[in-house]
Design a protein with these regions (language model features):
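Short aromatic/hydrophobic "clamp" motif used to bind/position activated sugar donors
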Residues: 84
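A conserved acidic beta->alpha catalytic loop
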Residues: 39-48, 88-91
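Conserved donor NDP-sugar-binding/catalytic core segment of glycosyltransferases
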Residues: 96-125
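Catalytic beta-strand/loop signature of glycosyltransferases that borders the donor
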Residues: 116, 185-192
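Acidic donor-binding loop at a coil-to-helix junction in glycosyltransferase catalytic cores
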Residues: 167-173
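Catalytic core of nucleotide-sugar-dependent glycosyltransferases
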Residues: 194-198, 203-231
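Short, acidic, metal-binding catalytic loop of nucleotide-sugar glycosyltransferases
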Residues: 23-32
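Glycine-rich, basic loop-to-helix element that forms the pyrophosphate-binding segment
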Residues: 63-79
Length: 250
C-alpha cells in the first residue's frame, strides 16, 4: 500500500465553503489517508456536515483564534502519518493528487512538492517535474500553497511555521525549510488543484499593501544570506530598481 497522507486544512470563518470542500475531500482521500481540519477560532464555530462527521479518517480540532501559522503547527503536530498535504477550504484537489505526490516524495524525501493549478497559463506548465532554486523565490513566488505536500520530518527540521507573521507565512516556511532542513523545491507537471480566484473571498487579499510589502521584505531578508547569491538575486534587484512589482502566489 502506498504511503498514507494527512490533508491539513485550517479554517477561519470559512463555513460557506464547507459543503463543496467536504465533497471534494471525501473524493480526494484514499482508504489509507487522513485529514485534520482545524477550526481557527471561527465565529460561530465550524460544524462539519454529516459526510465528514461519519468518516473515521477525518478529525476536527476546534481551537481559539491562533493565526494561520500556529494553527498549521497544531494540526500537523496531531498528524500520525509521515506525509502532509496542505489544502485551503476554498480550493479543490483534483483526482490523483495524493497518490502522485506520495509517489514523488517516496523517491525524494527531502522535497517540498508542489503542483500547478488548472487555472495556470499553459506556458508555465512544463513536461516532467522540475526543481526550482530557493533563490527563484526572490523574484516571485511560483507556488500555490494549497498544492504543497512534504514529509513531516521537513516541518520538524524547519521548526514549523512562523507564528508571528501577519502574511507571507507560506513563503517563510518554504525558505525556512530549505535553509534549516535542507529541503528542495519541486513542481510536478500535472495540475492537481483548482483554485478559488475571487479576491473578495480570499482572506489574505484583505491584508493592507504596506503590511504585505514590509512583511515580505522581512521574510526575504531573513534568509538572504543562507540562500546565497545567484542570477535570480540579480534579476530581483533589477526588477526592484525598475519598479516592477514582485509576482506572488497563494
Amino acid at each position: 500500500m502506498a504511503d498514507p497522507v494527512t490533508v491539513i486544512t485550517t479554517i477561519y470563518n470559512g463555513s460557506r465553503f464547507i459543503d463543496g470542500f467536504a465533497r471534494n475531500l471525501v473524493q480526494t482521500l484514499r482508504a489509507q489517508d487522513r485529514a485534520i481540519l482545524l477550526d481557527d477560532g471561527s465565529n460561530p464555530p465550524l460544524v462539519l456536515p454529516e459526510i465528514l462527521r461519519s468518516d473515521a479518517r477525518i478529525k476536527l480540532i476546534t481551537a481559539k483564534r491562533l493565526g494561520r501559522g500556529a494553527a498549521l503547527n497544531l494540526a500537523i503536530g496531531n498528524c500520525k502519518t509521515g506525509l502532509i498535504a496542505i489544502q485551503d477550504i476554498d480550493d479543490l484537489s483534483l483526482p490523483g493528487r495524493l497518490a502522485a505526490q506520495a509517489d514523488f516524495l517516496a523517491a525524494r524525501p527531502d522535497a517540498l512538492s508542489f503542483t500547478p493549478a488548472q487555472s495556470d497559463w499553459p506556458i508555465i506548465r512544463r513536461k516532467g517535474s522540475r526543481q526550482i532554486a530557493p533563490s527563484r523565490l526572490y523574484v516571485s513566488n511560483p507556488f500555490h500553497h494549497s498544492s504543497l505536500a512534504f514529509h513531516r520530518d521537513i516541518w520538524v527540521g524547519a521548526g514549523g511555521y512562523d507564528t508571528n507573521l501577519p502574511c507571507c507565512i507560506d513563503l517563510d516556511f518554504y525558505l525556512r525549510a530549505a535553509c534549516r532542513a535542507g529541503a528542495s523545491f519541486w513542481q510536478l507537471d500535472t495540475p492537481f488543484i483548482a483554485r478559488n480566484l475571487d479576491p473578495a473571498e480570499r482572506f489574505y487579499a484583505a491584508i493592507p499593501s504596506d503590511i504585505y510589502r514590509a512583511t515580505l521584505q522581512t521574510v526575504l531578508d531573513r534568509y538572504r544570506a543562507d540562500v546565497g547569491f545567484s542570477h535570480w538575486m540579480i534579476l530581483a534587484m533589477m526588477r526592484t530598481k525598475l519598479g516592477i512589482a514582485r509576482g506572488t502566489r497563494g
